[in-house]
Amino acid sequence: MYSSIGFAAQKVQISLSENVKKDLALTTDTESLDEVIIEANNERLNVRSSQMSANTLSTTTIKKIPVVLGEVDVIKAITLLPGVTSAGEGASGFNVRGGAADQNLILLDEATLYNSSHLFGFFSVFNPDAIKDLTLYKGGIPARYGGRVSSVLDIYQKDGNKREYHASGGIGLVASRLLLEGPIKKNVASFLVGGRSSYAHLFLPLFDNDNVAYFYDLNAKLSYNLNDNNRLFLSGYFGRDVFEISDSFANSFGNTTLNLRWNHLFSNKLFSNLSLIYSDYYYGLELKFVEFDFDSGIRNFNLKYDFTHYISNNIDLRYGINSIYYKFNPGDVTPTTEDSGINPFKLTDKYAWENAAYVDTEIELSDRISIHAGLRLSTFNRLGQDELFLYEDDNPIIYNESLDIYQKAKPIDTVSFGRSETIKSFANLEPRFAISYLLNEDSSLKASYNRMAQYIHLISNTTSPTPFDIYAPSGKYIEPQLADQVALGYFRNFKNYSFEVETFYKEVKNRLDYVDDADLIANDAVEQILLNGEARAYGLEVLFKKNTGKFQGWVAYTLSKSEQRTPGRTPTESGINNGEWYKSPWDKTHDISITGQYEFTNKWS
């Protein structure tokens, strides 16, 4: 007798004298029932787990959040969480616990995105229809993540439906989207493809406006089950923004990613994931009135091999390696006409190689105590380039004591390195630890510590990333940023509610600061305008959520302070602001967010 819930039973005669394997297709046998909604109880798991300072949002939750201009927005959704702020409308990126936007690691299917916004911050680069879920780590960051000192935003795309074809989309005031998914071979292979485009610029000529501003992006994913133990995924993203002001200038910028991923199941206790990843961020500017193009960007190739080992019911072990090769293009100028008057020139390309190995373990020591311990070893090699400037005493900035100002030092020589030669190397141990103590079935206390290293830097003297900014690697004159963070929290669940309160303290060493009148654009010696400083942030975060029922939502409150200082390098130097602490551009003492949704019927809310 073969039977399964929802299918009619079948009787089949078999011989007991020989080995037999039969695959049967059962016919459906359904009855109409009232709708039942099953939701994962993340709040209860959150009380028991040692993980803290992390928030997971499903696309269902994100789509329930009230929207502006008819567009569901992932980045605006996470800025409603405690500890997360935005520099404001029209500002790209987001800030976490007083950190800068470039200190956030943003991953889409494991590939790094260097700019998370369209139209200078009014929209995010994430198509909500293509997203499966996301997790934001503000602290207690697992050892499998590295490369940034503030946070990790880990986003995965849907795999595509392997049984049925589906289409979804939406039409907004300024943009529309469409997503298609379905089986290539039923129950074996599937596809997902989605696109978005804005069109508000099409109406500007009606108002005698020659300006142009629009974006478009494309998400795609292929999934293939080789067999019960092996799965392949190929996913990608391509996005572009275009902005033109009449006959003055035009610029375009955007991300490109590609990821080939292989999942392998060795046994029911050991799982692996091998990924080959490509990421690219491009910025192009055409200055029509002076007739030249300026292009810059950053590109990386990433190899990841991760293992998850379920040793016992109480012990999980994760370990793996990661290797990233970077190419930095600070910019090159190309005249667009013979009469331009601009000579072509190219800033020196830079190269680097970042490697890491990690181990993470989660252990339930008893019914009340759980720990999460990890260690990450990261290395960074600044590779060869043409014409590296040399300075007297290796000091690219000199201090004029009589004028009390910093000035550029004149290079005394240049030296060239081969592409595979190492100019300077760094290595850092990054320990991670978290512990949870269960007070009772509905409440717990948690504490965490993590150290993070960041080897690439956004060279920008604005409060938020802009397309004009460039990335630079650590090297002979630029030190990697190092952050230490501790947090303590109390977590409590009620019948339909959950409550979280956390306090944190974070210090960042080697935070870059800029001398007065720093020139960042088309600068082939940015070390002449940079000073090493430090930053700190501390605060209190509260999150109160209504998780079930017709009315759902949350209230988030953050009380925090974010400061930085750049002291003099010697007793005779004044530094910046006389070496005293001052508010960082991302300081926001009080921040409160309230979001809610009431469901009148299954179709109206």
Protein language model features and the residues they cover:
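Outer-membrane beta-barrel signature, preferentially recognizing the C-terminal barrel domain
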Residues: T79, N251-F253, T257, R261-L265, ...
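A beta-strand signature from Gram-negative outer-membrane beta-barrel systems
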Residues: K22-L24, L80-L81, V125-S168, R177-L179
